Amino acid sequence: MILGIDEAGRGCLAGSLFVAGVACDDQTALEFLKMGLKDSKKLSPKKRFFLEDKIKTHGEVGFFVVKKSANEIDSLGLGACLKLAVQEILENGCSLANEIKIDGNTAFGLNKRYPNIQTIIKGDEKIAQIAMASVLAKAFKDREMRQLHALFKEYGWDKNCGYGTKQHIEAISKLGATPFHRHSFTLKNRILNPKLLEVEQRLI
């Protein structure tokens, strides 16, 4: 049994970070590959939501999704939030798996406690369980940004999913940041305008 872990929203200027873990055996993973599973970035939103539903309802699949808000990212830092989320998944899902595979090149120092962790660069293209985790994390992120788009349409979150596209950066420059922006990220990019009041009034 393999536990695959991946994230969505790491490099976004707005919204939460989602880290997902999916545990299943290779036989079950093969079923998802036959359904068209691949790296979530190469799937249409419709296909991602379809696969998300199949993953969540499959009797032989264990899954965990951890959310870290923009506020938590600003308070603790992105690296700390990633580590805490992965740790939470391992604490919940470790008993289900004899192998743990994380997308990327860092185990966040957790390999001391969990020696069966393996980090795999582009793991979402190589390991089905990581691809399944990628699908879950991305579906959760997509859904969140669509919901936030209903509150703040000018930022184009339904299309850019919180990433720093030209339209998104121009909207921040013009309107200021919302309470859902990561201020630590937007300040770093020198695009944060202190016009918070204008957009915050809509939440009152």
From Swiss-Prot:
The reaction(s) this protein catalyses: Endonucleolytic cleavage to 5'-phosphomonoester
Enzyme class per UniProt: hydrolase
Keywords, comma-separated and alphabetical: Cytoplasm, Endonuclease, Hydrolase, Manganese, Metal-binding, Nuclease
Localization: Cytoplasm
PROSITE patterns (UniProt xref): RNASE_H_2
Top-level lineage group: Bacteria
Any GO BP annotation: DNA replication, removal of RNA primer
UniProt xrefs under PANTHER family: RIBONUCLEASE H2 SUBUNIT A, RIBONUCLEASE HII
Family named by the database record: Belongs to the RNase HII family.
Protein known as: Ribonuclease HII
Organism: Helicobacter pylori (strain G27)
Taxonomic classification: Bacteria, Pseudomonadati, Campylobacterota, Epsilonproteobacteria, Campylobacterales
